[in-house]
Design a protein with these regions (language model features):
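ATP/NTP phosphate-donor binding region
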Residues: 1-90, 335
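Acidic-glycine-rich active-site phosphate/pyrophosphate-binding loop
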Residues: 77-80, 173-179, 227, 265-272
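Short Gly/Thr/Asp-enriched flexible loops that form oxyanion-binding sites at enzyme active sites
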Residues: 80, 99-113, 152-153
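Glycine/serine-rich anion-binding loops at beta->alpha junctions
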Residues: 88-104, 144-150
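Active-site segments that bind and position negatively charged phosphate/pyrophosphate groups
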Residues: 208-324
Length: 382
């Protein structure tokens, strides 16, 4: 196992019914809560209950409901303005990855001292000019869609509508002070969102498993265990959305997949880098982009680096079966399903290169991915 240093300060309040503690827990962090979420019926009841809980706890609140998928930095900037006008001393993110990541970007933006908020973003891996935030107001997260693991990590993924780019902010000050993970909040998720979250959760761990260190029994068992848990419980939750056990397993698996436990000493996200371009340029939902890329990536690299893929096939399912599993969950498994054609591949490769290729001209992967290799993978994904 590689040497590593690990610290995660997030206090997690987990379990059915724990949402009822939101008011008292947020009151420990501040008295003016700026709630960041969507203007959507899927969270409206939760937001009403949260406002009441905060009021009972003596916390004044206001809602910022302008979050959209793949939160644009322009929206983040507006949130910063409104949070300052309100005099917020704590920010609360409620929803899936977009809401939580927007809340993180806003909470950092309020105190940001390096100009344009896009300066926070690692927008080029080959020419790193990002000035990540050094301080932020307290942030409290309440996920309603298990997927990104934002509730227990230091990352925020945002986009630029102007630049057609999607990348991340990475800073210690983005760790939430605390998060409530109540599986009951996921019961009303639409099936498509449930499936997207499950596939995104799988991808976080799969990327570490196939790219990371090859000599750790513990990490491999942990990684495969998370994937097996999601593969088992995702179809159950899709069939019966109020299955408490399945929803609980999916929620904790999503968190554990990207809070550092499964990947100490490793940081591999090449499939995500491709997915970000599919999202920013073609509007493909994040989970769908990974549903498309994963099977093609696996099929390509099994021929080059067979060991991890053969173990995946032995312990979970074959790559063709995995592709079928994703499709049966209701997600696309080919670029053509989303209107992407072979002639678009050079543009996609150029987009990935622009943001995610290192200074040595390859995508950070194990083995490294060249432009030519990426083009071949995308052809398999057609």
């Amino acid at each position: 196992m590689n040497a590593f240093e690990y610290a995660n300060p997030v206090r997690v309040i987990f379990g059915a019914g724990t949402f009822s503690r939101a008011g008292e827990e947020i009151a420990k962090l501040g008295k003016k809560a700026f709630i960041v979420s969507y203007n959507d019926n899927s969270v409206s009841v939760t937001l009403e209950k949260l406002t009441a809980l905060l009021s009972t706890a003596g916390v004044e609140s206001t809602k910022f409901l302008q979050v959209t998928p793949n939160p644009p930095i322009e929206m983040v900037a507006e949130g910063v303005v409104q949070a300052k006008e309100f005099g917020a001393d704590v920010v609360v993110g409620v929803g899936g990855g977009s809401a939580m990541d927007a809340a993180k970007a806003i909470v950092a933006g309020i105190l940001y001292e390096h100009g344009d908020l896009w300066n926070m973003v690692y927008a080029s891996h080959s020419n790193v000019t990002a000035k990540p935030p050094e301080k932020a107001l307290p942030i409290f997260l309440i996920p309603t869609l298990p997927a990104t693991g934002s509730e227990m990590n230091m990352c925020s993924v945002v986009s630029s509508s102007t630049l057609q780019k999607k990348s991340y902010i990475w800073a210690d000050c983005l760790f939430p002070k605390a998060s409530i993970l109540d599986p009951e909040l996921t019961y009303t998720l639409p099936p498509f969102q449930t499936a997207c979250g499950g596939v995104d959760s799988i991808s976080h761990v799969l990327e570490i498993f196939v790219n990371g260190q090859a000599d750790s029994d513990l990490l491999h068992e942990w990684q495969l265990g998370v994937i097996k848990t999601i593969v088992k419980n995702l179809p159950i939750a899709l069939k019966n959305p109020t299955d408490a056990r399945a929803r609980t397993e999916l929620m904790w698996s999503a968190t554990c997949g990207i809070n550092g436990w499964a990947s100490p000493g490793d940081a591999w996200t090449p499939m995500h880098q491709v997915g970000h371009v599919l999202t920013s340029r073609y509007g493909i939902n994040h989970g769908s982009s990974l549903a498309i890329i994963m099977p093609a990536w696996m099929a390509y690299f099994k021929k080059i680096k067979p060991a991890p893929y053969e173990r995946f096939e032995k312990e979970i399912m074959s790559i063709p079966e995995f592709k079928k599993f994703i499709s049966e969950c209701g997600l696309p498994v080919s670029l053509s399903e989303k209107g992407v054609k072979e002639e678009d591949i050079p543009l996609i490769v150029a987009g990935v290169k622009d943001v995610s290729f290192n200074a040595d001209g390859v995508l950070f992967s194990n083995p490294p991915v060249t432009e030519e290799m990426l083009a071949e993978i995308l052809k398999l994904a057609l």
